[in-house]
């Protein structure tokens, strides 16, 4: 139709051949998670009554409650908050952090400095009022190693006595690789080996449904993400 040259088409075919194995792996993960999603809807007995609009005034919101039950099953979690009231990923992370941390607690960011918007929530940059550090929460961090992998020895050293081990799974705005579930599990083991009651929290933005399990099934105690990314399609 466009009179493309044969050499150009050959380049296209070779490029697709190089990517075919990775595409097949991603398709397999997609199909697995699709079936997992359908099974969760079935097991949670989602029905037409859960899709009817309601004000929620003077009664419960069965649809919202059922959606959160489904998401808890999908992530292997005890419970979930899965609702449009969270305006962004940073808002969701903030709610989780303020919900868990108290004055005098110490959080350790073990994947280096968090991205800018969350740095303001924590109080690292000193430009936002009402941040965690102003609330009396202490902050420390462990940089990634030169190859972009977690510094397990440094994590074990700094997480002793800490309340939270904070993991940013995606690269965010940095030029480093995202963390795999295997790496998240290794970080969790390193932190809990020195502080068994530490809360391992994962910023899972961009990470939902990219593998067959979620961080809460591989050592994380608390996970937060963004509905405008993977879960929202």
Q: Can you describe what each PLM-predicted range is?
A:
Residues 4-14, 19-20, 27, 36-50, ...:
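Conserved PLP-enzyme active-site core in the AAT-like
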């Amino acid at each position: 139709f466009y009179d493309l040259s044969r050499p150009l088409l050959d380049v296209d075919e070779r490029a697709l051949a190089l990517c075919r194995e990775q595409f097949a792996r991603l398709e397999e993960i997609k199909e697995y998670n699709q079936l997992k999603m359908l099974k969760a809807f079935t097991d949670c007995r989602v029905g037409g009554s859960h899709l009817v609009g309601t004000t929620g005034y003077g009664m419960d919101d069965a649809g919202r409650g059922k959606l959160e039950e489904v998401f808890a099953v999908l992530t292997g979690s005890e419970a979930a908050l899965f609702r449009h009231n969270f305006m962004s990923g940073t808002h969701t992370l903030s709610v989780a952090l303020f919900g868990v941390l108290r004055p005098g607690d110490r959080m350790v960011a073990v994947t280096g400095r968090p991205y800018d918007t969350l740095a303001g929530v924590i109080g690292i940059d000193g430009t936002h009022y009402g941040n965690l550090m102003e609330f009396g929460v202490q902050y420390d961090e462990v940089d990634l190693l030169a190859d972009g992998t977690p510094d397990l020895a440094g994590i074990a050293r700094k997480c002793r006595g800490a309340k939270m081990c904070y993991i940013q799974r995606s690269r965010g705005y940095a030029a480093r690789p995202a963390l795999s579930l295997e790496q998240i599990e290794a970080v969790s083991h390193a932190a809990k080996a020195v502080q068994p009651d530490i809360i391992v929290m994962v910023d899972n933005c961009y990470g939902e449904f990219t593998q067959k399990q979620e961080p809460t099934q591989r050592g994380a105690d608390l996970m937060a993400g963004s509905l405008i990314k993977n879960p929202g399609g």
